UniProtKB/Swiss-Prot annotation:
InterPro entries: Restrct_endonuc-II-like (IPR011335), tRNA_endonuc-like_dom_sf (IPR011856), UPF0102_YraN-like (IPR003509). PANTHER family: UPF0102 PROTEIN YRAN (PTHR34039:SF1). Gene3D superfamilies: 3.40.1350.10. One of its GO terms (molecular function) is nucleic acid binding. SUPFAM superfamilies: Restriction endonuclease-like. It comes from the Bacteria. Belongs to the UPF0102 family. It comes from Nocardioides sp. (strain ATCC BAA-499 / JS614). This is UPF0102 protein Noca_3248.
Amino acid sequence: MTSSAAAAIKQALGAYGETLAARHLVGQGMVLLERNWRCEAGEIDLVLRDGDVLVVCEVKTRSSLRYGTPHEAVTDIKVARLRRLASRWVQDRGVAVRDIRIDLVGIVRPRRGSSVVDHVRGIG
């Protein structure tokens, strides 16, 4: 497999995971505000509202656990970056928020069987 083919597969898996995560969170009563918001400092996968709390959600999707769980891929450095990006999103959009929460949705999509979705609230 070429590196461009591998990159395309990885990108498709990520897009699948973000769509599945968004559906799951909206099904839990959250309101999706934005997907894949970017600035020069980075990207937020999903921005949602959960009541009066702004939720910035990192989505990690894996096709296997060979390289660890989706949760293991989110370091303290990544959480700190998401906090900074959340503040930047609020400033950029000019919205007032009472609180900001960072969530993680980890998805494992095996070759056979159903995907497993694990939502962790307040990772940092």
